Swiss-Prot record:
Its main location: membrane. GO terms for molecular function: G protein-coupled receptor activity; olfactory receptor activity. GO terms for cellular component: membrane; plasma membrane. The chain crosses the membrane at residues 26-46, 55-75, 100-120, 134-154, 197-217, 238-258, 272-292. It comes from Mus musculus. This is Olfactory receptor 5P80. The keyword Glycoprotein applies. It is a multi-pass membrane protein. Residues 47-54, 121-133, 218-237, 293-310 are cytoplasmic. Keywords: Cell membrane, Disulfide bond, G-protein coupled receptor, Glycoprotein, Membrane, Olfaction, Receptor, Sensory transduction, Transducer, Transmembrane, Transmembrane helix. Belongs to the G-protein coupled receptor 1 family.
């Protein structure tokens, strides 16, 4: 924002997607359904893993935490977005914006770390099966999960720390459906170079490091699979990785669009669409992806349903 006369404000206005009341009503119904499916799908994954002894393995422990993170990620954004569909503009206190951004960044960053941990788990299972029990022990799993949440919190601290040092001025209208960092910077009358660079370096580092771990894991996995003589063994190894690769491609494909591509190459509306995809749609798709192509999950679900009916 250009320097000059301004009035510091304590709340911001989220403009959402559209001013058209009919479109807002349709979007409200669509995203309410998506949010309901997200909550039910991910909660079902968590309950299924907890209640199925055959799923008490490192792979499914990580998956249960991914499901929990997806619930938190979607819940950080969707309720405010639904509220915005009921009115033209959504008023939110700056403190509320800080809390929402902190939650979004925490869960989003934690998801990156968990996806990397899951790639490492698949690497150990396929490339070093005899060492799996020691290299993916319960202690190692707890450390991986704890480090994932800690990494998410640290990254969120860099964003919220910078945001708390900013002042916001009129016009205090944010052209977005939630308190994302970049749109908030546009209405700040006090931001400097560091408030742009520090969060970018922090989030960029997480993306680069986790993508490197995932890519390296799958290079070794691919080499190991190609060395297998058994066709059945190859198919089994590929099937255990397909769901994870699909989830990784969807998640990193969208956040790369946001954080890597030059801002001038896409519009604010395109930014909103991509943001909806990775904060709202992907958390709904993950439990479907991991359920449809996973024999263990399908079998556990059948057993649980059979036990429930008896």
């Amino acid at each position: 924002m250009e320097p000059g006369n301004y009035t510091v404000v304590t709340e911001v206005i989220l403009l959402g997607f559209t001013e058209d009341a009919i479109i807002r009503a349709i979007l409200f119904i669509v995203f309410l359904i998506i949010y309901s499916v997200t909550l039910m799908g991910n909660a079902s994954i968590i309950m299924l893993i907890r209640r199925s002894p055959q799923l008490h393995t490192p792979m499914y422990l990580l998956l249960s935490h991914l499901a929990f993170v997806d619930i938190g990620y979607s819940s950080s954004v969707t309720p405010i977005m639904l509220k915005g569909f009921l009115r033209k503009e959504t008023f939110i206190l700056v403190s509320g914006c800080v809390a929402q951004l902190c939650s979004v960044v925490t869960f989003g960053s934690t998801e990156c770390f968990l996806l990397a941990a899951m790639a490492y788990d698949r690497y150990v299972a396929i490339c070093s099966p005899l060492l799996y029990a020691t290299q993916m022990s319960s202690t190692v799993c707890i450390l991986l999960v704890g480090a994932s949440y800690l990494g998410g919190c640290v990254n969120a601290w860099t964003f919220t720390g910078c945001l708390l040092n900013l002042s916001f001025c009129r016009p205090n209208k944010v052209n977005h459906f939630f308190c994302d960092y970049s749109p908030l910077l546009k209405i700040s009358c006090s931001h400097d170079f560091s408030s742009e660079v520090i969060p970018a370096i922090s989030s960029g580092s997480i993306i680069v490091v986790t993508v490197f771990i995932i890519a390296l894991s799958y290079v070794y996995i691919l080499v190991s699979i190609l060395k297998m003589r058994s066709t059945e063994g190859r198919q089994k190894a590929f099937s255990t990785c397909t769901s994870h690769l699909t989830a990784v491609t969807l998640f990193y494909g969208t956040i790369t669009f946001i954080y890597v591509m030059p801002k001038s190459s896409y519009s604010t509306d395109q930014n909103k669409v991509v943001s909806v995809f990775y904060t709202v749609v992907i958390p709904m798709l993950n439990p479907i992806i991991y359920s449809l192509r996973n024999k263990d999950v399908k079998e556990a679900m059948k057993k649980l349903m059979a036990n429930t009916h008896h």
